[in-house]
């Protein structure tokens, strides 16, 4: 029976308040309005961004909310005026929209679409939510809210992909893989024969490693306090790995000793201010580039010695790996289907939505 135009009742993982665990609830998902798409979410990743939300009571979020932004699914229905997807299409959800009209979208080097700011309201463009639970309106998150069996997203935050793509794998292209891989390829523009250091070997960091390898880096040094991550990092391209806790000197001094002149390209893939300072200090003093890939706390100010900038070092931000979301994501999926990209090592566990709190615990212990 068709559900077009009807309210859909389904399961969602709701955060009712800061610091609380996810609660699996039945929610009502309203039909899409103009320029909106309702999607059956088939697969979604648990990203470090959600972990930061769960671990902080100080983020400027509205509750209750449905998190999740790393998703893939099938279009269930479309609102008036939608022209780029149709019911039955396989799609990837995009926390970073591409409106195609703003200054960033029209600039060949830009990808930070102005419509991203809409996500901060945690509502749709008309100022309302498409989710309700127990008679209460539930806030959206990150333009996507994929921790729900069905979600409603603006058309500019949806990318149609290959009809035979495995959604349980390509959902990672929705954020983690693209963010890390693109940070190396697009943001840093890693050069052949260069030396790279990746601080943090989670899913995003491993994707950075793959990006550095694809760009032709001669030496890729992985840095993490969890030695269990080293084997996979080396399988994906890291030439060596270091645990700062095992070193007698600060990591930046060790990296200078190992390379004689410092690192060409450093990547902070954790979202830790102290690690960022160490990564920047590890860069070659004449031309080293440090890219901030991890999400840093918005409420904390950077404290980096000004002496580090009495040099040719560069510190760069990166959002979604520099990709223009709707334009480039289908191409990345096509590359995966052509076996040019490897997502499989990034998948450690597959759980049902009602096991989401178990997934959180696995990630906290470094097993996810």
Curated annotation (Swiss-Prot):
Its main location: cytoplasm. Its cofactor is Zn(2+). Zn(2+) 1 binds at residues 47, 69, 175. Stomach and liver. InterPro entries: ADH-like_C, ADH-like_N, ADH_Zn_CS, GroES-like_sf, NAD(P)-bd_dom_sf, PKS_ER. Zn(2+) 2 binds at residues 99, 102, 105, 113. This is Alcohol dehydrogenase 6. The lineage of its organism: Eukaryota, Metazoa, Chordata, Craniata, Vertebrata.
